[in-house]
């Protein structure tokens, strides 16, 4: 079997998710080829293989015990700690503002529809890729503002995460930030430019914002203490997609389906709640991620409702209102 046929064969097996732990060396070689991996030495390659093998065993175990499916993907030669350190970015700033009002949602949830999704109303912008920059906080907050703009003006726009990275002096750019502090920083800055005017660079740079080009301005921001998780069903249609904090460790190798087991060992990633529904009698939440469309369900993922999946209720949800 020549090399091309070999890779096609292994790729077909990988896509089927019917993994055999004894074939880990074959899967690893296909992974290296598919994702153009280059290691500094054979010692480093061996180290990466051992991490890959550990991740493969976890994927196999999850595929046997969860309703979701998991796969070898672009993160599979990284340890969980490495992935969290490089591709998330939720962290506590050294200082905070106090602009956002805190609202206690302790009323029982209403009886809304069984499913709702802002994507079906064309109010969610395309999935982005933060790359190796810990700016998930900027993507999640601006994703919510993009949706609010679409709800208000019936137009999809892309706002500048790079402006947030460079010009939000409360949060720490690619070194991390929080959701409500990002909204507070936008209020202080006066607005946000389009991505086309201030393109993404995935790195910390000097602030170059131009207030004459601000397209979206934030009027108020809110933080919600959610006593009943189902209360999000009432909130989501009212305020638009909601930025939320999670522990991303258990979703790294996610492919598709509803995640039933996602534990919380500490919040580290910001994502955007865009919808909810029911599949095979399992109620779920749908989140937009920032790891590109080649991850998960075209960049989105689903978790089971009412289990505090990935610690989604452990931090206050944040929203803002635009002018």
From Swiss-Prot:
Its EC number is 3.4.22.50. Gene3D superfamilies: Cysteine proteinases (3.90.70.10). It catalyses: Endopeptidase of broad specificity, hydrolyzing substrates of both cathepsin L and cathepsin B. Residues 17-112 form a propeptide. One of its GO terms (biological process) is proteolysis. Keywords: Disulfide bond, Glycoprotein, Hydrolase, Protease, Signal, Thiol protease, Zymogen. CDD domains: Peptidase_C1A. SMART domains: Inhibitor_I29, Pept_C1. InterPro entries: Papain-like_cys_pep_sf, Pept_asp_AS, Pept_cys_AS, Pept_his_AS, Peptidase_C1A, Peptidase_C1A_C, Peptidase_C1A_papain-like, Prot_inhib_I29. Glycans are attached at residue 158. Synthesized as an inactive proenzyme and activated by proteolytic removal of the inhibitory propeptide. One of its GO terms (molecular function) is cysteine-type peptidase activity. It comes from the Viruses. Disulfide bonds join 133-174, 167-207, 262-310. Cysteine protease that plays an essential role in host liquefaction to facilitate horizontal transmission of the virus. May participate in the degradation of foreign protein expressed by the baculovirus system. Belongs to the peptidase C1 family. This is Viral cathepsin.
